Amino acid sequence: MRKIVINGGLPLQGEITISGAKNSVVALIPAIILADDVVTLDCVPDISDVASLVEIMELMGATVKRYDDVLEIDPRGVQNIPMPYGKINSLRASYYFYGSLLGRFGEATVGLPGGCDLGPRPIDLHLKAFEAMGATASYEGDNMKLSAKDTGLHGASIYMDTVSVGATINTMIAAVKANGRTIIENAAREPEIIDVATLLNNMGAHIRGAGTNIIIIDGVERLHGTRHQVIPDRIEAGTYISLAAAVGKGIRINNVLYEHLEGFIAKLEEMGVRMTVSEDSIFVEEQSNLKAINIKTAPYPGFATDLQQPLTPLLLRANGRGTIVDTIYEKRVNHVFELAKMDADISTTNGHILYTGGRDLRGASVKATDLRAGAALVIAGLMAEGKTEITNIEFILRGYSDIIEKLRNLGADIRLVED
């Protein structure tokens, strides 16, 4: 069993560069199945989710080459083989294969999504969209079987009953080669949706409106190869900004798009965090006299659910009391119990997190219960006096590229230990 060991209480200083967006690349890679030539992705993060996706693509017959942060995928040899639950149960984003396989082959058998345990993640919106486009869906144990083999996919008007990033992207992927026009109403607006649409358009798709709540897709017969640069990871950026404010003595975060983080940064400014925003970087000063605030997550451009956990340790430095309410994943509270082991004054009731800042944290043995909870524990361990040991670190490695090396370069006493 691997674990992360941190000797905390050290001031950190220096620069850190943000990798490509995890939440983009996990959709971009399956979308490449639709191309009839090589697609190259730049700025691909070195995370275990990418390694898993590459393995799946190779099992299906794709040729994949990786060097540094470049991923070159030739999908011409892909075959439509069933992908059972066992092979992809670590991936939340396995459902993107639904759209890409339907779009290329007219059918798909894929295991149900895995990933972090944040409560129910229904795929009903995905299925509703596919069925509107002419597919049938049925469960076979832990697998989903989809078929539009007889009639093929056709355009449709689809209203998303709730705002869903995954369902919006999946519908776009399925619709780009469907016959006719597809209109997605009440679409999610996240930057990652724009990134996927940009790749697909560069491959020859006709998508308009990505980043707004109405997306229009006119189907095309073929998609060609292209080269695409993955956008910076706004969640990784927000995590390191929170870390820099919590334990930094001056840290510059490079490869950041401020416009993707405006809601998050506004809340930090409400706390009193001092920072300087440049064109593609943010410099976070050493902090003092921070104020407790309330956080409520919301779909983009609101406060991202993926950032409420990484922000929590910084909130514990602030003076006063506050609440955190996650309206997206109300069960995203498991980090609270681990932070309490580190002597944090924090609790949860009825899905609300209640905290009182100002108490020093102490090192402890804790467990990462999901990806962003793991990030919160890393930050807390860097803040705490003494040694912190974090287990279940596979969650952390799913989403944070080179996290140990990046933190060591700032002066952190952190290491990965093989038990």
UniProtKB/Swiss-Prot annotation:
Residues annotated to bind UDP-N-acetyl-alpha-D-glucosamine: 92, 121-125, 306, 328
Phenotype caused by lack of the gene: No heteroresistance to fosfomycin.
GO biological processes: cell division; cell wall organization; cellular response to antibiotic; peptidoglycan biosynthetic process; regulation of cell shape; UDP-N-acetylgalactosamine biosynthetic process
Chain positions found as 2-(S-cysteinyl)pyruvic acid O-phosphothioketal: 116
EC number(s) per entry: 2.5.1.7
Residues given in the record as phosphoenolpyruvate binding sites: 22-23
List of catalytic residues: 116 (proton donor)
InterPro entries: Enolpyruvate_Tfrase_dom, Enolpyruvate_Tfrase_sf, MurA_subfamily, RNA3'P_cycl/enolpyr_Trfase_a/b, UDP_GlcNAc_COvinyl_MurA
Xref: Pfam families: EPSP_synthase
SUPFAM superfamilies: EPT/RTPC-like (SSF55205)
Task performed by this protein: Cell wall formation. Adds enolpyruvyl to UDP-N-acetylglucosamine. Target for the antibiotic fosfomycin. Involved in heteroresistance to antibiotic fosfomycin. Heteroresistance is the ability of a clonal population to grow one or several subpopulations at a frequency of 10(-7) to 10(-3) in the presence of a higher antibiotic concentration than that predicted to be effective by measurement of the minimum inhibitory concentration (MIC).
NCBIfam families, sorted: murA, PRK09369.1, PRK12830.1
Alphabetized PANTHER family for the sequence: UDP-N-ACETYLGLUCOSAMINE 1-CARBOXYVINYLTRANSFERASE, UDP-N-ACETYLGLUCOSAMINE 1-CARBOXYVINYLTRANSFERASE 2
Name listed for the protein in its UniProt record: UDP-N-acetylglucosamine 1-carboxyvinyltransferase
